[in-house]
Curated annotation (Swiss-Prot):
GO terms for biological process: acetyl-CoA biosynthetic process from acetate. It comes from the Bacteria. CoA binds at residues 190-193, 308, 520. Transmembrane segments: none annotated. This is Acetyl-coenzyme A synthetase. Keywords: Acetylation, ATP-binding, Ligase, Magnesium, Metal-binding, Nucleotide-binding. ATP binds at residues 384-386, 408-413, 497, 512, 523. Catalyzes the conversion of acetate into acetyl-CoA (AcCoA), an essential intermediate at the junction of anabolic and catabolic pathways. AcsA undergoes a two-step reaction. In the first half reaction, AcsA combines acetate with ATP to form acetyl-adenylate (AcAMP) intermediate. In the second half reaction, it can then transfer the acetyl group from AcAMP to the sulfhydryl group of CoA, forming the product AcCoA. GO terms for cellular component: cytosol. The keyword Acetylation applies.
Length: 645
């Protein structure tokens, strides 16, 4: 194996960083040895409480029981907005950068307080109360953050659906959460194109008779259909409401939000997060992992429709009184220099994006980068998937000009906040490694039988204890929560990822070990794509796997078996691609479709996905034993016809 490069902590960063390595070690050891004392101190330091909790932490992962700060009361919107008014009411809270370079807006903490209060009162006026679910289907506009915080203010549980999802996917999520209110927009704008969010919502609601109210944000002024009894203009409803809305006193363990994520089987799961533990996790990681210093501009390029946007555009930064940037556009519009132009325009200090964006921009060459100064940058970050060392090096040398540490952060929708990442002032960096665990996180590598592996080794990544921002359940299905995450290795949380630990104890994430593919940093369950493909009346069976993709990390490779008598064609391929987009969204579009007369199955009828993955990845010399297949000749045909030669 080639020698791993090590990049030491720059002296300029070390000088002012919140923590050095000794301080990290001391805090980490305490968080593992004395969780009660440690979490109690942090909860007091980072959050404001209405009343104190009884028990700091209680968990029994073998039973699926997780509780932190139970009995304590607080409010997330109060912590993200109200408590900053006295000291920084006139400071910018959110910088909004629109799709077009000449559109932007600065929203102060005082503005934010009023906007959140008005919407909170407008929701209450329409019958929304503590515990009710509100679905948010918005583009990257400030109203998305306002809607999240307004829900949190009154104790309603928000469920955000990414604006790129189809009407069918939106409908399923509204139905599963049993939401009675939807907040959407006339249209979204992205990369110079408009997205028909209101039309998608109308279509989705044909199957959701329970939805009583739809708030519509006016983003483009485009023509939309209107349902008089149900639809209300967001700006009109807010204008009629008072800006002052008393924050609901929430128990630490009350749900804050549900966010749907792809699983390896069946329909998406509604990951449910708590109030206090989640907010504490996002605030602490935002401060320490990004080494956030007061007054800096922090930019996470994610969409609020994903957990990264929840935790690191809205909740973490605002809990810390930060200036957070929200970007409506895409990295390549109007040209491939847009990210760096925005960095210069708003003097961004901390920049957090996905490896897939870095690889795409790297492919466009350095000219767009060189036209900008980027001198304000101090810390760079990556999220969503492991970053390959080549992309890491380009990010470090070309974007950061050798002066900005890169925090390669590993976490999941389910974990709520970052679990494994370097601290910029404390740890030497190895390109491609997620480095070391955050406070209170105890990673282990286990073999398939659950034996804990010591030292430098490869294995399945599990976490051996609960942490505050950990998901509490799958909405409406605690049994599925337990079976998915806690049953495989009793007493441990199973991440679904494989990892390697090196001789320095650094962790390297090697990718999913289940049937989930990571496309451009977003999870896509193979079962979801397969279900969409078999809806076509000419398709008898489909199997979907991931394969290495230069830009996206993983691409979607679909093997499709047709009904007897049906012929493969390019037209049929196009129809199948359209079907996936219609059922799920553009993110689920197969990159490669291979028509296969048969799939490799065991004698009991189970599809051998391992073989399909190897064929899709052209790893033909490591297919393993095919003798257990019902018909081993199927594999020869797959290899001969493979579309990825």
């Amino acid at each position: 194996m080639s020698e791993t490069k090590v990049y030491p902590v720059p002296e300029t960063i070390q000088r002012d960083a919140h923590l050095n390595f000794e301080q990290y070690q001391e805090m980490y050891n305490r968080s593992i040895q004395d969780p009660e004392g440690f979490w109690s101190e942090q909860a007091d330091k980072f959050l404001d409480w209405f009343s104190k909790w009884g028990t700091t932490c209680h968990w029994d992962l073998a039973k699926g029981d997780i509780r932190f700060f139970e009995g304590g009361t607080l409010n997330v919107a109060y912590n993200c907005v109200d408590r900053h008014l006295e000291t920084r009411g006139d400071q910018t809270a959110i910088i909004w950068e629109g799709d077009e370079p000449d559109q932007d807006e600065h929203i102060t903490y005082r503005d934010l307080y009023e906007r959140v209060g008005r919407l909170a009162n407008a929701l209450k006026a329409r019958g929304v109360k503590k515990g009710d679910r509100v679905c948010i289907y918005l583009p990257m506009v400030p109203e998305a953050a306002v809607a999240m915080l307004a829900c949190a203010r009154i104790g309603a549980v928000h469920s955000i659906v990414f604006g790129g999802f189809s009407p069918e996917a939106l409908r399923d999520r509204i139905q599963d959460a049993d939401a009675e209110v939807v907040i959407t927009s006339d249209e979204g704008v992205r990369g110079g194109r408009s997205i028909p969010l209101k039309a998608n919502t109308d279509k989705a609601l044909e199957g959701c008779p329970n939805v009583k109210t739809v708030f519509v944000v006016r983003r483009t002024g485009g023509d939309i259909a209107w349902n008089d009894g149900r639809d209300v203009w967001f700006h009109e409803a807010c204008a009629e409401a008072s800006p002052d809305c008393p924050p609901e006193h929430m128990d630490a363990e009350d749900p804050l939000f549900i966010l749907y994520t792809s699983g390896s089987t069946g329909k998406p799961k509604g990951v449910q997060h708590s109030t206090a533990g989640y907010l504490l996790g996002t605030a602490m990681t935002h401060k320490y992992i990004f080494d956030y210093q007061d007054g800096e501009v922090y930019w996470c390029t994610a969409d609020v429709g994903w957990v990264t946007g929840h935790s690191y555009i809205v909740y973490g930064p605002l809990a810390n009184g930060a200036k957070t940037l929200m970007f409506e556009g895409v990295p390549t519009y109007p040209d491939a220099g847009r990210f760096w132009q925005v960095v210069d325009k708003h003097e961004v200090s901390i920049f957090y994006t996905a490896p897939t964006a870095i690889r795409a921009l790297m492919g466009q060459g350095d000219d767009h980068v060189k036209k900008t100064s980027r001198k304000s940058l101090r810390i760079l970050g990556t999220v969503g998937e492991p970053i390959n060392p080549e992309a890491w090096e380009w990010y470090y040398h070309t974007i950061g000009e050798d002066r900005c540490p890169i925090v390669d952060t590993w976490w999941q929708t389910e974990t709520g906040s970052i679990l494994i990442a370097p601290l910029p002032g404390a740890m030497d960096l190895k390109p491609g490694s997620a480095t070391l665990p955050f406070f209170g996180v105890e990673p282990q590598l286990v073999d398939d039988k659950g034996n804990v592996l010591e030292g430098a080794t490869n294995g399945n990544l599990v976490i051996n204890r609960a942490w505050p921002s950990m998901m509490r359940t799958i909405y409406g299905d605690h049994e599925r929560f337990f079976n998915t995450y806690l049953a495989a290795y009793p007493g441990k949380y199973f991440t679904g990822d494989g990892a390697r630990r090196d001789e320095d104890g650094y962790y390297w994430i090697t990718g999913r070990v289940d049937d989930v593919i990571n496309v451009s940093g977003h999870r896509m369950g193979t079962a979801e794509v397969e279900s969409a493909l078999v809806l076509h009346d000419k398709v008898s069976e489909a199997a979907v796997v991931g394969y290495p993709h230069d830009v996206k990390g993983q691409g979607i490779y679909a093997y499709v078996t047709l009904m007897a008598g049906e012929e493969p064609s390019d037209e049929l391929k196009q129809e199948l691609v359209k079907l996936c987009i219609q059922e799920i969204g553009p993110i689920a579009k197969p990159d490669i479709i291979q028509f296969a007369p048969g799939l490799p199955k065991t004698r009991s009828g189970k599809i051998m996905r391992r073989i399909l993955r190897k064929v899709a990845s052209n790893e033909l010399d490591s297919l393993g034993d095919t003798s257990t297949l019902a018909d081993p000749t199927v594999v020869d045909t797959l290899i001969e016809d493979r579309a990825n030669q």
